């Protein structure tokens, strides 16, 4: 830090509120999402936005009986700092053909829509696809067709694949 500049805060530090999600809760939420999607389908393929969309896409595809799964790899976070969007891997030609080039009959799945930047980019690639997320924040929610839980914009979701169980000493031993 030079010349009295404030340190750059991570997205997590700016968010302030924590929303930890266990594996059990995440699986229940994905199944609830599937119940809603079952009324919308059928779908020819599931497109997972990686990496966060991989786990929910696997659960949703299994529950809906969809065998074709593809990914679109977009990097926007470096650990916990959001940066410029970078398409690392586009949607396969085979999946694009299944969706008629516009995404019709395709299901895009992600864990969360936050600011909507990633969602907007994928929507441009597949404008007629159905976009589903497990969680949604207000800024990104308008881009999503189906979601399960809305959280405030200032909430940081701790997904089970990003966390680990750890020992905490009892309060009487000075734990906060």
Swiss-Prot record:
UniProt cross-references to InterPro entries, sorted A to Z: PRibTrfase_dom, PRTase-like, Xanthine_Guanine_PRibTrfase
Any one biological process term the GO annotation gives:
XMP salvage
- The EC number of this protein is 2.4.2.-, 2.4.2.22
Instruction: Enumerate the UniProt keywords alphabetically.
Output: Cell inner membrane, Cell membrane, Glycosyltransferase, Magnesium, Membrane, Metal-binding, Purine salvage, Transferase
The reply to whether Cell inner membrane figures as a keyword in the UniProt entry is yes
| Residues that bind Mg(2+) | 111
Identify which cofactors the protein needs according to its UniProt entry: Mg(2+)
What compartments host this protein? Cell inner membrane
What molecular functions are annotated in GO for this chain?
guanine phosphoribosyltransferase activity; hypoxanthine phosphoribosyltransferase activity; magnesium ion binding; xanthine phosphoribosyltransferase activity
Catalytic class of the enzyme: transferase
Q: Does the keyword Nucleotide-binding apply?
A: no
The protein's annotated catalytic reaction(s) are: GMP + diphosphate = guanine + 5-phospho-alpha-D-ribose 1-diphosphate; XMP + diphosphate = xanthine + 5-phospho-alpha-D-ribose 1-diphosphate; IMP + diphosphate = hypoxanthine + 5-phospho-alpha-D-ribose 1-diphosphate
Give the primary localization class: membrane
The entry's function note states:
Purine salvage pathway enzyme that catalyzes the transfer of the ribosyl-5-phosphate group from 5-phospho-alpha-D-ribose 1-diphosphate (PRPP) to the N9 position of the 6-oxopurines guanine and xanthine to form the corresponding ribonucleotides GMP (guanosine 5'-monophosphate) and XMP (xanthosine 5'-monophosphate), with the release of PPi. To a lesser extent, also acts on hypoxanthine.
| Subunit structure as annotated in this protein's UniProt entry | Homotetramer.
| Protein name (record) | Xanthine-guanine phosphoribosyltransferase
């Amino acid at each position: 830090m030079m010349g009295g500049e404030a340190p750059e805060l991570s997205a997590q530090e700016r968010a302030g509120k924590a929303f930890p999600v266990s594996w059990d809760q995440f699986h229940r939420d994905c199944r609830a999402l599937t119940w809603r999607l079952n009324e919308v389908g059928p779908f020819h393929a599931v497109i997972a936005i990686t990496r966060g969309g991989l786990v929910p896409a696997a659960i949703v595809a299994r529950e809906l009986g969809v065998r074709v799964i593809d990914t679109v790899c977009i990097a926007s976070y470096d650990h916990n700092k959001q940066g410029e969007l970078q398409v690392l891997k586009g949607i396969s030609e085979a999946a694009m053909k299944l969706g008629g080039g516009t995404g019709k009959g395709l299901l895009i799945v992600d864990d969360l829509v936050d600011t909507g930047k990633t969602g907007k980019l994928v929507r441009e690639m597949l404008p007629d696809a159905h976009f589903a997320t497990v969680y949604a924040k207000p800024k990104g929610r308008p881009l999503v067709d189906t979601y399960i839980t809305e959280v405030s914009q200032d909430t940081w979701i701790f997904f089970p694949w990003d966390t680990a169980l750890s020992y905490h000493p009892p309060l009487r031993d000075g734990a906060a």
